[in-house]
């Protein structure tokens, strides 16, 4: 293999880097990546003899054909969808039970589906929780396409499933039969084996020990770990559960030592490690980081070391896992591995380890910012401390306890993990909030990565290092503070939230979204771990825009769809003050929620102005102190840049009449329709008088109340107002300097 590598015309790391640009040019249809690839090709022909460069071009052509073929296959699969499914084979290790909700991945006719089902009884729930063997399920269900991206910078579930080879979701209406079956498929049997291990651990070990055992040994974290998952994430150390080189090395080395003690030769052992690698990969759910680590370990067996090892791993991943670099896990895994490879020869000892941790943290920062928009500075120290604890203590300890459990489960050590979780809770309370950097666009990301690479390369040249440091600071500043004005109506489902920020960084948030509480009573077994709308929509968007502080949070009314996620938002961001109407303070439950935020609350009156965009938002209503109902909604109006905006909260027809009576000459270009398009708002008289050029409606897709109402839609059509709806267009955003340009996610 080493001889084969020597025949490559250019260093292997250069080739892998060149092909990475080509990969993104094809799979992401990125003109920027294509430009980068062409630029590197030109440099190649300048730097190397044409004959050698020509050979590289041939290699690029072969990989380009492979990438195009894979991309075409995925395109065909997304177009040639199944019409119906009556039978699926359950992949046992994908089973997830959350309250009365069941989800798993199932195979049918060569396709994989993401399957959902509402469990009908506690007995049925227990049966699926205990299911470990391969089963075929006969069913009645409905196929649909996965939900795509709904907010700028938001999670794209459809794109994620596509990287897993899944193009449709299946909602089961009725299970007709469940039959245990045999299979010769290696993947299915490994899925069953992994599920058996998970269920064994869950039934023989107490909480929280079992979560750490399934997490560190099998890469499986269940819904009952949700609270701790959030704490580890907020501290920037959730990657401790991402199986990687340390775990792979631990198990591979242990396997080799065991077989060598049994008398096997090195030659036979080399081939057995391939079988072990396949089984271990299956037991960890074919995790991206495990696959990468195993490949590097296997290549090292053949004498491929250092950068050649990493580069060849990348080339193999291009072939065996074409979607690897389209996932956050894949990109981060390779980024960590690359930086480790680059810094591995810089000495030994505690000082070298500390330097390595610093280089890794800084080097990975732009990529972390791109995917998560924030960074926890405490993660430097916490990773340094807890990685030793997890890798050198917990991993071997839990491995031994798991092996012993088949003879006698040792559960007396559960107190160690209870102590650990207590310590994590304490640290999360005293630690500062993560630093919000924002999400860099593709140009900024590439410039940041190149700049950091130059910093590492020129680290001994103080003058150049100073210039580069200033450049990097400027790039991060542009990421956190985009030099533009924006008004964004986010897609928060059947709720409402509008974000305003001007070029100076002044921020106003109108409502926070939420979910109306259900009166339906549920049994204990049906209770599930849930996340709020804000945690899935509003909070990620604001962080992607670099927002760490909201200067003024305006709550227009007390409906849960407008204020339900108040606590989540005030926990995630520093809020300068909360502005409410005087009437809303008569609602005791609402006042209690305001007090729980521990934030300054101020009631506003008609005529009060809130400066932003070089202009101001004026409070037009309510003129009288009401009881906090819909007509007690705060109504905001202002000329923002070149257009007049009117935000009406949940104002109904009576309130609209009063508004027109007080302001008969109101000029409105953009109207935010009241009550999500309910027919009780946006009356004919109101619309005929204002004649807004555009109307914004925040409404949930396929909402139960079927809003916006047809009458409202007809009225808006009658005045030729251009309607933007979040259920159809996703998030809607106005951007600009002196005038607005409108864009939507869809």
Task: Describe the role of every protein-language-model region.
Residues 1-77, 292, 743:
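N-terminal leader/targeting segments
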Residues 2, 165-294, 552, 644-647, ...:
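Aromatic-rich juxtamembrane segments at the membrane interface
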Residues 2-4, 61-239, 536-540, 549, ...:
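Membrane-interface helix/helix-cap signal primarily in integral membrane proteins
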Residues 4-15, 52-55, 209, 213, ...:
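Membrane-interfacial loop-to-transmembrane alpha-helix junctions, especially the N-terminal start
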Residues 25, 29-32, 39-49, 54-60, ...:
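Hydrophobic alpha-helical transmembrane segments in multi-pass membrane proteins
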Residues 127-128, 137-142, 153, 182-185, ...:
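Non-globular, low-confidence helical/coil segments that flank catalytic cores
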Residues 341-438, 694:
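Alpha-helical transmembrane segments of multi-pass integral membrane proteins
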């Amino acid at each position: 293999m080493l001889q084969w590598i020597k025949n490559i015309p250019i260093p292997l790391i250069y080739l892998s880097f060149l092909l990475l640009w080509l990969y993104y040019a094809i799979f992401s249809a990125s003109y920027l990546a294509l430009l980068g690839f062409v630029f590197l090709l030109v440099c190649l022909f300048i730097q190397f003899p044409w004959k050698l460069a020509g050979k590289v071009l041939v290699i690029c052509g072969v990989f380009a054909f492979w990438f195009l073929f894979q991309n075409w296959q995925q395109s065909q699969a997304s177009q040639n969808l199944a019409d119906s499914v009556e039978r699926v084979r359950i992949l046992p290790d994908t089973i997830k039970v959350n309250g009365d909700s069941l989800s798993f991945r199932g195979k049918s006719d060569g396709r994989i589906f993401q399957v959902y089902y509402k469990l009908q009884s506690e007995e049925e729930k227990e049966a699926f929780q205990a299911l470990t063997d391969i089963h075929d399920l006969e069913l009645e269900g409905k196929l649909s396409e996965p939900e795509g991206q709904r907010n700028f910078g938001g999670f794209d579930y459809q794109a994620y499933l596509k990287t897993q080879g899944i193009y449709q979701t299946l909602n089961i209406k009725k299970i007709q039969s469940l039959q245990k079956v045999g299979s010769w498929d290696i993947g299915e049997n490994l899925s069953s084996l992994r599920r058996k291990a998970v269920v064994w651990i869950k039934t023989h070990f107490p909480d929280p020990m079992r979560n750490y055992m399934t997490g560190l040994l099998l890469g499986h974290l269940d819904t009952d770990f949700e609270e701790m998952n959030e704490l580890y994430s907020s501290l920037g150390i959730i990657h401790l559960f991402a199986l990687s080189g340390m775990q792979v090395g631990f198990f591979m080395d242990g396997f080799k030592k065991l077989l060598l003690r049994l008398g096997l030769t090195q030659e036979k052992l080399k081939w057995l490690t391939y079988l072990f690698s396949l089984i271990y990969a299956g037991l960890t759910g074919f995790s991206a980081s495990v696959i990468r680590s195993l490949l590097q370990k296997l290549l090292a067996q053949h004498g491929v070391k250092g950068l050649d090892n990493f580069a060849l791993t990348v080339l193999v991943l291009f072939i065996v896992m074409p979607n690897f670099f389209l996932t956050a896990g894949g990109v981060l895994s390779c980024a960590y591995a690359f930086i480790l490879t680059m810094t591995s020869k810089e000495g030994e000892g505690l000082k070298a380890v500390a330097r390595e941790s610093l280089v890794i943290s800084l080097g990975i920062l732009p990529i972390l910012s791109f995917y998560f928009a924030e960074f926890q500075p405490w993660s430097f120290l916490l990773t340094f401390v807890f990685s030793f604890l997890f890798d050198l203590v917990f991993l071997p300890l839990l491995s031994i306890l798991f092996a012993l459990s088949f003879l006698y489960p040792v559960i007396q050590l559960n107190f160690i993990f209870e102590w650990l979780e207590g310590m994590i809770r304490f640290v999360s309370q005293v630690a500062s909030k993560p630093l919000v950097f924002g999400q860099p666009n593709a140009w900024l990301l590439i410039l940041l990565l190149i700049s950091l690479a130059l910093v590492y390369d020129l680290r001994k040249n103080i003058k150049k290092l100073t210039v580069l440091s200033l450049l990097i600071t400027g790039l991060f500043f542009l990421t956190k503070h985009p030099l533009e004005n924006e008004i964004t109506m986010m897609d928060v489902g059947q709720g409402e939230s509008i974000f305003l920020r001007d070029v100076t960084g002044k921020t106003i948030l109108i409502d926070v979204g939420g979910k109306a509480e259900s009166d339906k009573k549920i049994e204990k077994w049906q209770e599930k771990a849930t996340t709020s709308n804000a945690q899935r929509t509003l909070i990620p968007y604001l962080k992607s825009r670099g927002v760490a502080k909201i200067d003024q949070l305006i709550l227009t009314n007390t409906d849960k769809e407008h204020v339900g996620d108040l606590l989540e938002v005030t926990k995630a961001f520093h809020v300068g003050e909360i502005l409410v109407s005087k009437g809303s303070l008569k609602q005791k439950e609402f006042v209690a929620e305001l007090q729980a935020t521990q934030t300054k609350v101020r009631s506003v009156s008609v005529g009060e102005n809130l400066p932003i965009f070089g202009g101001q938002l004026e409070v037009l209503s309510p003129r009288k102190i009401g009881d906090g109902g819909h007509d007690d909604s705060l109504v905001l109006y202002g000329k923002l840049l070149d257009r007049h905006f009117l935000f009406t909260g949940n104002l109904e027809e009576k309130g609209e009449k009063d508004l027109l009576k007080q302001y008969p000459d109101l000029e409105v270009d953009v109207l935010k329709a009241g009550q999500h398009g309910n027919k009780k708002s946006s009356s004919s008289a109101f619309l005929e008088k204002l004649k807004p050029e555009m109307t914004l409606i925040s409404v949930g897709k396929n909402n139960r109340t079927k809003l916006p109402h047809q009458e409202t839609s007809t009225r808006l059509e009658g005045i030729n107002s251009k309607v933007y709806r979040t259920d159809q267009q996703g998030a809607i955003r106005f951007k600009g300097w002196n005038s607005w340009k409108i864009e939507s996610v869809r």
